[in-house]
């Protein structure tokens, strides 16, 4: 499906349902997010691909397969129906190993026509974001994954936990070095104050896409390394997006994150560059420290990183190629 995760969330909400995991944004293609294993960061459920019940793959011009785990919820009638709908014979395959391969297959096993995904009763997200100085409190939570230890405001056992980290020591030192975001899933029964449509659109985060080409254009005129103007822009961007005080919000899963277009401007067409590193949760703190130290070394060589670092925790997966794959015996 080319439908985004957010659209599917909002369609499900109209039926009193929701996807079990929400991730950190919702503009991605639903099928693409599953096939690449790049969406969803629920500490108790896992990623989006961990909620998939079956995958319908076209493996040749004349054959398709409906893959599910052994003892899965579908029967041969489902495969027969898909075959009639699409005019390609479909075979039901109920096999744990095939299912682990098919859920996150990076496009290598065939063309995804359909996915069957679990849905749960509609819930809302209670979100808390807090700023932290360049001290030990937020670093300690990287190790314990217990955000309440940082300042007592966050829940002890959240469903979602994320850090946004400034790549360099902030100037002035009284500015936040990191922001902690936790979310809990709570049953939705029409409570007042819960946003049901996307309203939180941060234009500042999209404007950051203009910084790298701007630097490239005026590179000869910008003194590197450690240019205070660039550091100031990065700090201002992060402050503007995440603030300097604690903030709370309540929203349905399809409303917590803004759409990719706003005021007629398609911000989804702007493209930056990113990299993703996966650590075992026990190595989260040393892993982040290695990244921060590397960025500092690169800045000394004149290569400044104009952005932030996002750290998310997710339950391990049994899908073979999932970035969050757990150790399997």
Report residues per predicted region:
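Noncatalytic alpha-helical scaffold of FAD-dependent oxidoreductases
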Residues: 1-329
């Amino acid at each position: 499906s080319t439908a985004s995760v957010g659209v599917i969330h909002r369609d499900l909400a109209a039926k009193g349902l929701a996807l079990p995991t929400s991730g950190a944004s919702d503009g991605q293609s639903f099928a693409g997010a599953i096939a690449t294993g790049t969406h969803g960061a629920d500490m108790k459920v896992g990623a989006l691909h961990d909620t998939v019940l079956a995958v319908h793959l076209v493996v040749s011009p004349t054959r398709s397969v409906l893959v599910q785990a052994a003892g899965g919820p579908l029967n041969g009638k489902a495969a027969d129906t898909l075959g009639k709908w699409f005019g390609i014979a479909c075979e039901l395959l109920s096999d744990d190993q095939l299912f682990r391969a098919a859920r996150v297959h990076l496009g290598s096993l065939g063309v995804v026509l359909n996915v069957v995904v679990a849905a749960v009763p509609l819930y809302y997200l209670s979100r808390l974001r807090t700023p932290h100085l360049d001290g030990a409190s937020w670093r300690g939570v990287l190790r314990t994954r217990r955000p309440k230890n940082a300042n007592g405001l966050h829940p002890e056992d959240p469903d979602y936990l994320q850090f946004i980290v400034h790549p360099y020591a902030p100037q002035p030192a009284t500015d936040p070095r990191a922001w902690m975001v936790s979310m809990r899933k709570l049953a939705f029964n029409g409570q007042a104050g819960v946003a049901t449509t996307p309203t939180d659109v941060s234009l500042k985060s999209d404007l950051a896409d203009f910084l790298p080409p701007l630097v490239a254009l005026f590179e000869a005129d910008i003194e590197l390394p450690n240019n205070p103007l660039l550091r100031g822009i990065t700090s201002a961007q992060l402050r503007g997006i995440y603030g300097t005080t604690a903030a709370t919000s309540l929203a349905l899963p399809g409303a917590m994150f803004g759409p990719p277009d706003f005021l007629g401007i398609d911000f989804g067409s702007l493209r930056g560059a990113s990299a993703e590193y996966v650590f075992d949760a026990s190595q989260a703190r040393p892993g982040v420290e290695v990244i921060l130290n590397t960025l500092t070394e690169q800045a000394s060589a004149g290569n400044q990183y104009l952005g932030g670092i996002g750290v998310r925790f997710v339950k391990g997966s049994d899908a073979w190629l999932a970035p969050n794959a757990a150790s399997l015996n």
